[in-house]
C-alpha cells in the first residue's frame, strides 16, 4: 500500500507542481490567476479520466465524485485548497487535494463503489495571498461568503476581484450561495507546517483542535524631529516605544509557555529615514492559543501594557483588532476513530493541535471534521524549501484512505 502511494505521488506531484512554478524553485498560484485556472482545469481532466464525475461550483471550487450505492445523498468529503502564497512550496494545500484523489482512486480500484458518495474537493482559495479575503473556497461551500465583501476589493496590481473572477469564466453570485447540507464528514490531510512531528520522529499527527487567532494592526503617533538636534529626553520616538512593547510582550509570551505564540510580523516606521526621529510606527501582532479564554486574557493584558508604555512616553496609540477567530475543536468521534486507526496500523503518531489556520476550521462547526498531519522537514512552509519525506507523504495518503474507507464503505 505504501509502495503504491509512493509511486502515485512521485508520478502526480511533480505534474501538479509544474503549474505555477517559479523560476526560483517555489510556486505562485493565486486565486483566479491563469496558473490557478490551468491547475483546476488540468486536475479536473485527470479526475474525470480516472472515472470520477467532475464539476465546478459557482466560485471555482472543483469536485470529483464517486457515487454511493446505498446512501447516495450522504457525502464524505476530502481535499484542501489549491492556491498558494507568493513563492511558496508545493505541498501546502495542493497535496491535500491530490492526496484525496489518490486515496479515492485506490479505494475505488480495491473495493469498488462505496455505500456513501465520496467527493474530492480542490478548494478555490484559502490563503488570502492575492486579495484581502481568506477562505473564499470553504466559506462558499456553506453560504458564509457575502459577495458584497469582495465586490470592490482589488489585488496589489489594481485588478478587481470581479474582473479576475470573470477572466476565469466565473461570475460573482448576487447573493451568498446555498449551504451544502449533504456533507456527512470532512477529512483534510495537510502538512504540519511546523517541526513537532519531525522533532519527535513521528509520521502522523491526529489534529484535535485548530488554534484561535487574534490579529491587530497598531499605530503609534509621536513626533518626527531632527535626529541630531533633538535631545534623547525630548523625543517622542515611536520606534523606541515599539521596541519596548515588542520586547516586553515577547518575554511575557515566553513566560506563559506553549501553546501560546506571539508574533510581531510587520513593522513600518515613518518617515523611515536615517536622520529623522520616527514620528509614526505601524505594526502588526499575531497571537494564537488553543483556549479562547486564555487567548482573550493574554491579549487584553497586552493591550493594557501597550497603552501604559505609550502613556509614559507621551505617544498616542490606536489598536485595531481586525481578526478574532475562536479555537476550533475537531469532531471527538472522528478524532477517536482516527486514533484507533493509527493504533491498529501501529503508526508512529501523536495527538496535537494545529498552530495554523486551515479550511477544516470552516467545516468543523458545521459538519463532523478531522485533520491528518504529516511532518514538515525542518518545520519549513510557505517557502520554496517546503519539503516532506516521500515515505511520510505516502503514510499520510494511506491513513487518509483507511479513514475514508471507514466513513464511506462501512455502515
Describe the function of each predicted region:
Residues 9, 15, 22, 79-80, ...:
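Zn-dependent metallopeptidase/amidohydrolase metal-coordination segment
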Residues 78, 88-127, 214-220, 226-252, ...:
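Alpha-helical metal-binding/catalytic segments enriched in His/Glu/Asp
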Residues 125-126, 130-292:
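Midchain, well-structured core segments that form catalytic/ion-binding scaffolds
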Residues 44-48, 53, 62-164, 395:
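Active-site metal-coordination/substrate-binding segment of hydrolases
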Residues 21-67:
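A non-catalytic alpha/beta surface segment that caps or lines the substrate-entry region
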Residues 38, 210, 226, 230-256, ...:
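His/Asp/Glu-rich mid-to-C-terminal helical/loop segments that flank catalytic regions of hydrolases
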Residues 29-32, 263-272, 284-290, 316-335:
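A short beta-alpha structural unit
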Residues 2-33, 124, 382:
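N-terminal capping segment at the start of a domain
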